Amino acid sequence: MSNYTTTNRFAFLPGTIIFEPGTSKDYRELERHHYRIRPPRTWAYICVARFVPRGKRSPGRLVAVGVLSWPIAMHKTRMVHFNLPTDYGTNARFANENLRTISRVIVHPQFRAIGLAREIVRRLIEACPTPYVEASAVMGRFAKFFTSAGMVQIDSDPEKPAYFLYDKQSEQA
């Protein structure tokens, strides 16, 4: 994945959306717009979207950020889906070798409902070095950007956060 990309998907805007790798500083700039108070516990990769108005050459205004994190070792829905035993060591090894977790997707309120979250998720999936990308989100049952980015919602307890999985190996089939 290149360090700087754009897409025609947002051609209706009076400027350009630029996607590039980000930093934890970028995350902190938008974190107040997320429903979870604490930042992610780990950071494997950060993707940001910046809006540059037509005719400007500035770095652009930060409008979205997504964080790819190292997975937690024990996740019940994952264990059931992959038929994993309940011991910590096996789960930790499987998770670290095969998964990364999309832990945050934040879009500035002025730029919501135009597909930026879906595009950030797609780019996090593309940047991920592992065969699987997962996400677990309380709002996932209502905000459909994970499924519109190609992730599959795995049935889980309706009282728990929704669980999503993307199998990068299925792209090659």
Each language-model region and where it sits:
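Conserved acetyl-CoA-binding loop-helix of GNAT-fold acetyltransferases
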Residues: 107-126
